[in-house]
């Protein structure tokens, strides 16, 4: 009887150890299979911004004169997304649409669903990169944080979003003066067009097609 009891004891202890090891393995697999940057503790609404090149002059949407920035070499802005991913506006020969958005701006809040639908419906012209910049971020203003706002709106995953610095370094480099703000940069890295305000998607499509020669 004593021998049988000892054998059962060893079996129970072995089973417990197996459960513990198995549980640890499951935790390890779960951790390695998920992006730790997506946890709320690793999301940042701001990032350090570096700018290469000269800043563009401030955009005056009320002026009938030709935008002085057209034809200028666009600065290259580098920063991080909300989860720490490195992002740069250097299109490396690809035409780029830059979209500057502020979470508290009602015009931006109306424009974002249009942009989302534009992409979902496959109406975004091919052959361009779209990069958004979340700027003007202020925890004291409504609809904060921008990361959650854009997630709720199902902002396209293929469109990277740069979290601007608290002093709007990225926005200032491109001459932002109002929201939402659009800058189209051609394949040579030159400014093709700048726009501000609520822009209809058919108008945006037409301008992009002009830029890429469609």
Region annotations inferred by a language model:
Residues 75-96, 120:
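A short beta-strand-turn-helix
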Residues 97-98, 130, 182:
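Hydrophobic beta-strand anchors of alpha/beta hydrolase catalytic cores
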